[in-house]
Structures are given as structure tokens and as C-alpha cells.
Amino acid sequence: MAKGLDCGTGNYVACLSDKVKTQRNAFITIDQSMNTKKSLKRLNIPYVEINNKLHVIGKAAFEYAQVFGNVALRRPMADGLLNPKERDALPVLRSIIYELLGEPETPGERVIYCVPGTPIDKDTMVDYHESVLQSLIDGLGYSSRAINEAEALAYTGLVDNNLTGIAISFGAGMCNVGIFYGGMTAKAFSVSRGGDF
């Protein structure tokens, strides 16, 4: 059975055979102590440990940042792509992806993941972003393949129109646009402004 993964700036969403799981794409850093670690484990709060610091990930990070106020909510992605200013982005993303996908049901199980189109208003490295995500997913024992986000939307939203029309995704980091005719992509691109702008 294959799985789907939408890798968004605001949320990561996994489509599994029996359910859809969502995790906020954010984290906070807290000091490590035995009591803190035990509390996180007891409350089943996802975290990753990097350089003697605990990074609480996902929805729990957002909630803690709201409650404590003086804790900075950080994001491993910005403007629809990997955040180049966030050095802990990769281990955090690996944890978010693992929490959503879990272990493969069979070795090399297929995961299709979304990537943005090339921005028309900014010079960015979409290929690098795609390669890093593939490495993170494949590193968990999956066999992954990228799909343009607008194309993925077209496969669900344009089915009744013979896959002909326009698909637009308004994400937190960018907007993805695709123009399709009879299932073929006439044009696909992104604009590097989204809901966080």
C-alpha cells in the first residue's frame, strides 16, 4: 500500500490507507533535564534531542509557545522550502515525517510526496529541497517519488473535468499553480508568497 505526504510550510499531512494524519511543521527548543524528558515521554509529546537540547515538535510545540509566550516557535521550512537559516531543520523534519508515516508496512513501500513548482518571482533551489525530502523519506525505509503540488491537486480536483483546468494551492509559504489539459501539464509554477506573508 502506498502513502501520500504533503510537505507544507505550515503543516505536514500524511494520507495513509485508513486515515489522514496532520502535524504542524514547527518546533520549540527547551533545556534538557531528566524531569522534562520524562514528562514529555509520559504525555506522549513528540520531541527530538539535538546537542543536549530538546526540540518539541508539531502541534505540541505550537501549544507550548502559546502558553509560555517567551519561547520562540521555529520552523524547519520557510517560503515553501527548507529553511536555510534553521540548522536543526533536518532532524526535526525527519521526526515529523517519521511520526506521520511510521515504519513501512513492507520494505520499500511507496511514498508520494508533494514539492512546489519553481517560483517565478524568486531564485530558489527547489531541486535541493526535493532531494533532501527524498533522502529523509527513503532513510526511513520507504521508496519515495516527488509530485508537483498543483499536479497532485489536479488529480483530485479535476477528475470530473477530464483533468482539464487550473489547480491552485494557497499554502503558508507559497502558492502553487498548474494549468492542465487532458491530464497533461501545460504550465506549472509557484509564487513565493503565501499565508504567512
Q: Where do the PLM segments sit?
A:
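Nucleotide/phosphate-binding catalytic cleft detector across ATP-hydrolyzing
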Residues: 1-170, 181-197
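Glycine-rich SAM-binding Motif I of class I
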Residues: 173
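A structural feature that tracks compact, well-ordered secondary-structure segments
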Residues: 176-178
